[in-house]
Amino acid sequence: MSRPRIGAAAAITQLEGWAIAPNHKDAIVKTFRFDDFNQAFGFMTRVALMADKLDHHPEWFNVYNRVEVLLTTHDADGVTDLDLTLAKFMDSAA
């Protein structure tokens, strides 16, 4: 069963530094920067453990000290409370 959509516009009002994804139906994006690759990879590891617990996984891209993240709930075809929960966790883990 799909979760109800809250929408990207509503989600970013509750988050710091997140934006509506360009060229995407309903998603939020953020780029995290760290001192080095080790910190970026540590962040990704912490987020991966939480994502597994939530059974909700980000689309992300990593180059050296930068992690670009896109969150959306595919079966809801947009942003849901799962995306908001994972985004808030990412902000606290960064």
Swiss-Prot record:
Alphabetically ordered keywords of this record: Lyase
Q: Which reaction does it catalyse?
A: (4aS,6R)-4a-hydroxy-L-erythro-5,6,7,8-tetrahydrobiopterin = (6R)-L-erythro-6,7-dihydrobiopterin + H2O
Q: Which domain of life is it from?
A: Bacteria
Q: Which Pfam families match?
A: Pterin_4a
SUPFAM superfamilies according to UniProt: PCD-like
Q: Which InterPro entries match?
A: PCD_sf (IPR036428), Pterin_deHydtase (IPR001533)
Q: Which GO terms describe its molecular function?
A: 4-alpha-hydroxytetrahydrobiopterin dehydratase activity
- E.C. number, please? 4.2.1.96
According to its UniProt entry, one GO biological process term is: tetrahydrobiopterin biosynthetic process
Which family does the record claim for this protein? Belongs to the pterin-4-alpha-carbinolamine dehydratase family.
Q: Which PANTHER family match?
A: PTERIN-4-ALPHA-CARBINOLAMINE DEHYDRATASE (PTHR12599:SF0)
Official protein name in the record: Putative pterin-4-alpha-carbinolamine dehydratase
